[in-house]
From Swiss-Prot:
Primary role: Synthesizes selenophosphate from selenide and ATP.
Residues annotated to bind Mg(2+): 57, 97, 233
Lineage: Bacteria, Pseudomonadati, Pseudomonadota, Betaproteobacteria, Burkholderiales
Gene3D superfamilies in alphabetical order: PurM-like C-terminal domain, PurM-like, N-terminal domain
GO molecular function: ATP binding; magnesium ion binding; selenide, water dikinase activity
Protein name (Swiss-Prot/TrEMBL): Selenide, water dikinase
Gene Ontology CC annotation, any one: cytoplasm
Reactions listed under catalytic activity: hydrogenselenide + ATP + H2O = selenophosphate + AMP + phosphate + 2 H(+)
Subunit note: Homodimer.
A Pfam family recorded for this sequence: AIRS_C
Enzyme Commission number(s) from the entry: 2.7.9.3
Cofactors, names only: Mg(2+)
Length: 354
């Protein structure tokens, strides 16, 4: 008989201690934009190549003509109940932003908040070990961090990397005629929602863990390709939100082919059964006015396209002649489902789904 159980490992369940999980617990994009508008403009720093004036994945500071520092931080509440897996997912997700800038990680610091009077100490230790294991896989030290006693469990990393300042890849700079390539299948938010509702079987759980703990290492290699014009990763704002950011930053329209999108197992069926996250609706509220969805698409298309991804795949905008080399880089690192999902065309900061 096939085991259909999903590991929980803790009592109480980690996901029962938080009101959200993974990148789905980001502040809603509309509210975040309003909050950031209230901040004072950042003073000019000539060596700050990427700062907070754009919606990019990390900050980049030039040290010299050959080296720039990539700095980012990312943390969230549990998306799964297994503490080791939670630590792995959070660490993989944090390092992804370094790769998404074309950088190579150098070291990381842990961000830890745990209800220490609620969770057994061995559970908290397992979360930390999960993060350590991913840093070891990435070949970097987890060199320190900071911890607090918090009501809800949170874990993540400050990730520091290095990149050639001439090779920084941004979520802008795409060119008309570029091809869009996605590195990982979609649907993590829906699978995590199914897990909370005890609707996810062992196979679905395994697929989710495999996707969310796979390091986006091809990003560091993609930075060396002249044909790669823009790069980002798909996380809490969903495929539509992050593709729209790339389109706006490039002053173009992204055309996404719905039939070509890769999905994790069971995601479409779960969406049809009404399983989704609240972040999906918040994403649509923020971006829907700039999205074209034909009436011929399935009724679940909007939910699927706005599904928040945790530790999602890289989105590459590259010249047509670079497609084979980009796909070869992905597949050499085990990203067998990397595929072409659309193209960039003339327009003014929209996403058109066809």
């Amino acid at each position: 008989m096939t085991d259909t159980s999903v590991p929980t490992s803790t009592s109480p369940r980690l996901t029962s201690l938080s009101h959200g999980g993974g990148c789905g617990c980001k502040i809603a994009p509309g509210l975040l934009a309003d909050l950031l508008k209230r901040s004072a403009p950042l003073p000019f720093f000539p060596d700050l190549l990427v700062g907070n004036d754009t919606a990019d994945d990390a900050a980049v500071y030039k040290l010299n003509d050959e080296q720039a520092i990539v700095a980012t931080t990312d943390f969230f509440m549990p998306i799964v109940d297994d503490p080791f897996d939670f630590g792995r997912i959070a660490a993989t997700n944090a390092l992804s932003d370094v790769y998404a800038m074309g950088g190579k990680p150098l070291m990381a610091l842990a961000i830890v908040g745990m209800p220490i009077n609620v969770l057994p100490h061995d559970v908290i230790a397992a979360v930390l070990k999960g993060g350590e294991s991913v840093c070891a896989e990435a070949g970097i030290p987890l060199a320190g961090g900071h911890s607090i006693d918090s009501v809800e469990p949170i874990y993540g990393l400050v990730a520091i990397g290095v990149v050639d300042p001439k090779r920084v890849k941004r979520n802008a700079g795409a060119q008309a005629g570029d091809v869009l390539i996605l590195g990982k299948p979609l649907g993590v938010g829906i699978l995590s929602a199914a897990l909370k509702k005890d609707r996810l079987d062992a196979a679905g759980y395994a697929a989710m863990i495999a996707a969310t703990t796979k390091l986006n290492r091809p990003g560091a290699e993609l930075s060396r390709l002249d044909g790669v014009h823009a790069l980002t990763d798909i996380t809490g704002f969903g495929l539509l939100g992050h593709t729209l950011e790339l389109a706006r930053g490039s002053n173009l329209t992204a055309r996404v082919r719905y039939a070509d999108l890769p999905w994790l197992p069971d995601v479409v069926g779960l969406a049809e059964a009404g399983i989704f996250t609240g972040a999906s609706g918040r994403n649509w509220d923020a971006y829907g006015k700039s999205i074209g969805l034909p009436a011929s698409l399935p009724a679940t298309a909007r939910t699927l396209l706005t599904d928040p991804q945790t530790s999602g795949g890289l989105l590459v905008s590259c010249a047509p002649q670079a497609v084979d080399e980009v796909l070869a880089l992905f597949r050499a690192d085990g990203f067998g489902e990397a595929c072409v999902i659309g193209e960039m065309v003339s327009g003014e900061g929209r996403v058109e789904v066809v």
